[in-house]
Amino acid sequence: MTSNVMNALDKIKDLPLFKEELYFTGGTALSYYINHRISEDIDIISAKELEYKKIIPSMLSIDAKKIEDENVFALRLAGLFPDEYVLKFILDGVKIEFFYANRATQKEILKTSSFKYYKGANLKILDVKTISKLKIVALLQREKSRDLFDFGAMLEHQIVSVEEILPIAEGSKNIKSKEELLKFLEAKKEAKEDEAVYLDEANRLDLSFEEIKKRVVLQLKV
């Protein structure tokens, strides 16, 4: 985690809204456990539709700025109210995203999750296995270097096994075997506006998408 992220977490961790079913997850939460890379944003997941009437004023009270999500238009077209599904803020240069776990696979993962309190405050951080499983869902749905890198770190630290990965892959993409998963990963292409992966805050060496993908495929083949 960067110093900016740690400062942002310190500002939000005692907010009363985190007494609700909101959980710290994502790449930054994963790095809290395994310190595998620099992570520069904060993801908060909810098992139910976002209580935006509580979240928005609470975040504004600590001088966070609300920003629009790129999926707002698509959500409106689907007849949904965007603020119930995703809310994004910037706090001291750190992006903080609240999102509703509306996919069936995400809901199933959260049913068996556990958590602990971040620094003994109101903010709850999910257990490392649940964070990892949710990151796998993200990996299957989008093209991001950070998702690929995080997946490799999960394999390296033996957080999840292939036997635990495949049910998630089948539920999300009908991938039923390790061989099918390898083909899926090998076919991944870098997104046009991909976010860089850094291992060190002071020495920001950017790892390429193809380099990360090659490493992950080799790890999965072992």
Question: What is the role of each PLM region?
Answer:
Residues 1-222:
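Compositionally biased terminal segments of proteins
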